[in-house]
């Protein structure tokens, strides 16, 4: 009578860690293999993450104080009243693209102080 793979797996699952370690050692000797050589790294150690240097400022919602948001947009983008109003009313919209992190943060603060919801992407 031979054991199935499932029966072997159940038997191993019931073993202690010490017994499993001994079993692995015995299998390595019997079959002439090493479990150390079979370990495959899951990610490359030389992986580097590039820091983003250009950001887009997106007006997502104008909030309750529409007039203050229009004034803030006019001030930071140098638009006329009608153009700023049309731009604000078409939210969500990208106000500025490819700007520095500091400039994006400053623009976000100005617009949020006026009552708008802003995202930096």
From Swiss-Prot:
Key words, A-Z: Ribonucleoprotein, Ribosomal protein
GO terms for MF: mRNA binding; structural constituent of ribosome
InterPro entries the UniProt entry points to: Ribosomal_bL12, Ribosomal_bL12_C, Ribosomal_bL12_C/ClpS-like, Ribosomal_bL12_oligo, Ribosomal_bL12_oligo_N_sf
Top-rank taxon, per record: Bacteria
Function (record text): Forms part of the ribosomal stalk which helps the ribosome interact with GTP-bound translation factors. Is thus essential for accurate translation.
UniProt similarity note: Belongs to the bacterial ribosomal protein bL12 family.
Name of protein: Large ribosomal subunit protein bL12
């Amino acid at each position: 009578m031979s054991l199935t793979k499932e029966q072997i797996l159940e038997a191993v699952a019931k073993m202690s860690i010490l017994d499993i370690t001994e079993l692995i050692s015995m299998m390595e000797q019997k079959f002439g293999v090493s479990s150390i050589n079979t370990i495959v790294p899951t990610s490359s150690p030389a992986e580097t993450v590039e820091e983003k240097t250009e950001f887009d400022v997106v007006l997502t919602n104008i909030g309750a104080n529409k007039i203050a948001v229009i004034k803030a947009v006019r001030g930071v983008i140098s638009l006329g009243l009608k153009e700023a109003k049309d731009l604000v009313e078409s939210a969500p919209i990208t106000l500025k693209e490819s700007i520095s992190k500091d400039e994006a943060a400053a623009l976000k603060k100005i617009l949020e102080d006026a009552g708008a919801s802003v995202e930096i992407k």
